[in-house]
Amino acid sequence: MPRLLRLSLLWLGLLLVRFSRELSDISSARKLCGRYLVKEIEKLCGHANWSQFRFEEETPFSRLIAQASEKVEAYSPYQFESPQTASPARGRGTNPVSTSWEEAVNSWEMQSLPEYKDKKGYSPLGKTREFSSSHNINVYIHENAKFQKKRRNKIKTLSNLFWGHHPQRKRRGYSEKCCLTGCTKEELSIACLPYIDFKRLKEKRSSLVTKIY
């Protein structure tokens, strides 16, 4: 019995030592510069590709443009060529591809109108993907705009919490502060907050894209 008690006390002591080390790690500031700073933030946030994350954060509408162009291309512009387009009159110089492209875009806009849907029960190109309505795209754009506004407000609030009332530190910047004076784990974890919001936006975006298709 005394032996078991000694072992349990020893195990408890080791656990307390480990816990105190972790606490000191969190509260102690470490000087991190350049790629070492990026690696530490990556380890904290668990995100592997930061260059891709920055690109998607800065251009949230790029996917929307790509999806819109895919939907127009799905209609194959050559299927909308009219007899006038196929054999243009002399001297006009009409480009059959550009004219067909305009007809494809006009057809896409018409199919998103409720009046057109009432008149036409089915699409002549049943095998192609159905187009999203303008309402769904407006919801998608509204979600992105709301995310950008929320992100700007959060960064402004976190900047005040992080730097306090030190304009010189604010000018110095996050990475320079971590390099010159050091950052604690709590301060480094601030960089994870935009990524958490970005993950939530991606979940909303995937649900919206599912509705569109």
UniProtKB/Swiss-Prot annotation:
Positions of disulphide bridges: C33-C179, C45-C192, C178-C183
Annotated SMART domains: IlGF
InterPro entries linked to this entry: Insulin-like, Insulin-like_pep_6, Insulin-like_sf, Insulin_CS, Repro_Hormone_Insulin-like
Entry keyword annotation includes Disulfide bond: yes
Keyword Disulfide bond among UniProt keywords: yes
Keywords: Cleavage on pair of basic residues, Disulfide bond, Hormone, Secreted, Signal
Compartments it resides in: Secreted
UniProt GO MF annotations: hormone activity
Coiled coil segments of this chain: none
Any one of the GO CC terms: extracellular region
PROSITE patterns: INSULIN (PS00262)
UniProt note on tissues of expression: Testis specific.
Signal peptide start and end residues: 1-20
Principal location listed in the UniProt entry: secreted
Propeptide: 55-168, 201-213
Record-stated family: Belongs to the insulin family.
Function summary: May have a role in sperm development and fertilization.
Name the record gives this protein: Insulin-like peptide INSL6
